[in-house]
Amino acid sequence: MSERKLFTSESVSEGHPDKIADQISDAILDAILAEDPEAHVAAETCVYTGSVHVFGEISTTAYIDINRVVRDTIAEIGYTEAEYGFSAESVGVHPSLVEQSGDIAQGVNEALESREGDTDDLSHIGAGDQGLMFGFAINETPELMPLPISLSHQLVRRLAELRKSGEISYLRPDAKSQVTVEYDEHDKPVRVDTVVISTQHDPEATNDQIRQDVIEKVIKDVIPADYLDDDTKFFINPTGRFVIGGPQGDSGLTGRKIIVDTYGGYSRHGGGAFSGKDATKVDRSASYAARYIAKNLVAAGLATKAEVQLAYAIGVAQPVSVRVDTFGTSTVPEAVLEAAVRQVFDLRPAGIIQMLDLKRPIYKQTAAYGHMGRTDIDLPWERLNKVDALVEAVKTVL
């Protein structure tokens, strides 16, 4: 009897309370970067019934209308009706932002290496905090992501498309998905075992109608038929009713969906959130760099699965460690891959910012449906432009 393994990941829609908070934080970041690419931003958001609080630390020459940014973001998500208990024009907006701590700024603005005489411009910026970050890639999908999180994201994106187009008129913005994939003894995905979808809806919609529409127009549209069989289980709004949702149902906070944002639990996570942070915060930029490295390693055929860990000390430019784990799938020793990575990628914060062009207002679009593996938008850390360089670097190391 072959060994049966199950793995589950989840995603949430743009109308989920925590994702509303993420999108507001990143909309503020983008608005600031559009005027001041050198700004340092750490913007946190809390949302609940009828109210939005924005707080954190910002150092910038830009002036932005935070009230307008917040309301526009909420409207774009779809909270435009007072009956939702949270709407763009009636919500209270309460900003409380201060300047970044001078103690932190001195280490970011002039790294330890620069203070000790290193004249390289890319050694000038120090890491905005200590910490460890992970990036991951696997050959389960064309975008080199784990299948469970890839399908979970696609399901809630499809729900949003049907809601915004009006094709399913009773849908409201809040939704969640969860997909359980069965793997064979070789760790290859063979079928989808369980799909869970909870979607907010108008009170008039019936459970039978919701179930039929979600299965036919969402699940079967997203999940390839080869993965579905008579034993696949569908749980559609299993509580029986989901009218009260969004911030009226639960409060939301920036940074509470870090597993949804990355690999759905399939890879390790360093614990740092992304949204609302400029690229001097290595929680964000180094996580993107680690994904960039891992994806190019797998695309180069150097491994079928790769996890990259980077770690930093606050105020220091060079990473304190670089680790590559291929789980026994690499074609060369992992020490060789680590040496090649150090040759090809400049992993100082300024090097990452330059390599991935991270001073641009590109972040709001990442704040829902995943920061990694996106095929609907062009993100620099998803590009496969280091494949040849990695292959050549491996040859020189060997």
From Swiss-Prot:
K(+) binds at E44. GO terms for biological process: one-carbon metabolic process; S-adenosylmethionine biosynthetic process. It is found in: Cytoplasm. This is S-adenosylmethionine synthase. Residues 100-110 are annotated as: Flexible loop. Mg(2+) binds at D18. InterPro entries: ADOMET_SYNTHASE_CS, S-AdoMet_synt_C, S-AdoMet_synt_central, S-AdoMet_synt_N, S-AdoMet_synthetase, S-AdoMet_synthetase_sfam. Homotetramer; dimer of dimers. The gene is metK. Gene3D superfamilies: 3.30.300.10. The lineage of its organism: Bacteria, Bacillati, Bacillota, Bacilli, Lactobacillales.
